[in-house]
């Protein structure tokens, strides 16, 4: 226990990027909202200026979600500036253009675009390994949930799934010549099977066209339905991924109210139980949401106890002003400490860094090597 407290304290010292701030006198509320508002000693504003102020207040008023977050977690008056290590690459290149054109042609969606992933340019263009990758998003581009970190569109009644989507996705992926693909989806609480049948069909059709391809399915929680989990876990995939997104203590502040930590852990346990031997399980969390090092360590311990093989850590990036603010920018040194700790805990692979995302190209490269090594061992044993 003493060692864990020491590690948490060490992480806390390296954790936060905190630029200096100047302190100035505090103006009145109306002066803060409208710099042209006179001081209390001056004459009262005209009716026209009052009407203008009311319009500004209405336009800038926080949503109920923003108000709730400000009470529960706390917000900053100004967004934190990005530190030097949070640099994004501008997308480009022939492979990038080719993948984007094919996606538009078949009316397919990627989480890379919908979630504004900072690694989109690297993954689509091939990056260091030369193999282009993309994370395909099925079941449409509209989610039935409204997590406070996610930029995907939401609706209680999204359009019905395209029955041709499994075939279109399989054909598109097969034509790209990839070795490893990630298939994910929005939440579809409106469907009787939560979309699990559509998911399984997509994997199965792809296996027919490209039997040698390694497939990772990054799935929603299916409301914890064991039958839905089993349907996807036994569809022929190699990696069953489901993200817990944040530490246990911040679940209600970060995720939709229909999601929770226990339900996600149970989904990962069920996947390990139902999937064929050798199938890897994987999860991911964002840092910079207000968590403490001790909470991260505790969450890692519970994830590992659920039998999860792979865990990734990345920096939360606010997609827009409508989403929850970044609490802090976690330093690369702190990310490295979490990676090292994860390896010590027994995770087979840990990807941890500011720009890492759950579907991360470098991680997929190492996971592919792990799967091939497991296959080689199994063949030798036979």
From Swiss-Prot:
InterPro entries: Aldolase_TIM, Elp3/MiaA/NifB-like_rSAM, LIAS_N, Lipoyl_synth, Lipoyl_synth_mt, rSAM. [4Fe-4S] cluster 2 binds at residues 143, 147, 150. Residues 128-348 form the Radical SAM core domain. Its EC number is 2.8.1.8. [4Fe-4S] cluster 1 binds at residues 112, 117, 123, 359. GO terms for molecular function: 4 iron, 4 sulfur cluster binding; lipoate synthase activity; metal ion binding. HAMAP family: Lipoyl_synth, Lipoyl_synth_plantM. This is Lipoyl synthase, mitochondrial. It comes from Oryza sativa subsp. indica.
């Amino acid at each position: 226990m003493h060692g864990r407290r020491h590690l948490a304290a060490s992480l806390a010292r390296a954790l936060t990027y905190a630029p200096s701030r100047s302190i100035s006198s505090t103006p009145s509320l109306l002066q803060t909202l409208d710099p042209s508002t006179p001081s209390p000693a001056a004459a009262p504003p005209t009716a026209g200026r009052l009407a203008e102020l009311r319009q500004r207040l209405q336009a800038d008023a926080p949503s109920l979600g923003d108000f709730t977050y400000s009470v529960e977690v706390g917000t900053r008056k100004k967004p934190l500036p990005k530190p030097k290590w949070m640099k994004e690459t501008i997308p480009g290149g022939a492979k990038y253009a080719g993948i984007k054109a094919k996606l538009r042609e078949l009316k397919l969606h990627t989480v890379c675009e919908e979630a504004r992933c900072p690694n989109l340019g690297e993954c689509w263009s091939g990056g260091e390994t030369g193999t282009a990758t993309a994370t395909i998003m099925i079941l449409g581009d509209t989610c039935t949930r409204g997590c406070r970190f996610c930029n995907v569109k939401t609706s209680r009644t999204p359009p019905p799934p395209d029955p041709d989507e499994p075939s279109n996705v399989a054909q598109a992926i097969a034509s790209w010549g990839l070795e490893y693909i990630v298939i994910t989806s929005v939440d579809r609480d409106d469907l009787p099977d939560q979309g699990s049948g559509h998911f399984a069909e997509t994997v199965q059709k792809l296996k027919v066209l490209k039997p040698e391809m390694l497939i990772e399915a990054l799935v929603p929680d299916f409301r914890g339905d064991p039958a839905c989990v089993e349907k996807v876990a036994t569809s022929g995939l190699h990696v069953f991924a489901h993200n817990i997104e944040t530490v246990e203590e911040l679940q209600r502040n970060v995720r939709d109210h229909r999601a929770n930590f226990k339900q996600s852990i149970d989904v990962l346990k069920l996947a390990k139980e139902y999937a064929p031997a050798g199938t890897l399980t994987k999860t991911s969390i964002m840092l910079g949401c207000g968590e403490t090092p001790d909470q991260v360590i505790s969450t890692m311990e519970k994830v590992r106890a659920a039998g999860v093989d792979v865990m990734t850590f990345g920096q939360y990036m606010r997609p827009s002003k409508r989403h929850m603010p970044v609490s802090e920018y976690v330093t690369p040194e702190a990310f490295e400490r979490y990676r090292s700790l994860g390896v010590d805990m027994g995770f087979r692979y840990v990807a941890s860094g500011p720009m890492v995302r759950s579907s991360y190209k470098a991680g997929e490269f190492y996971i592919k090597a792990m799967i091939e090594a497991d296959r080689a061992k199994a063949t030798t044993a036979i």
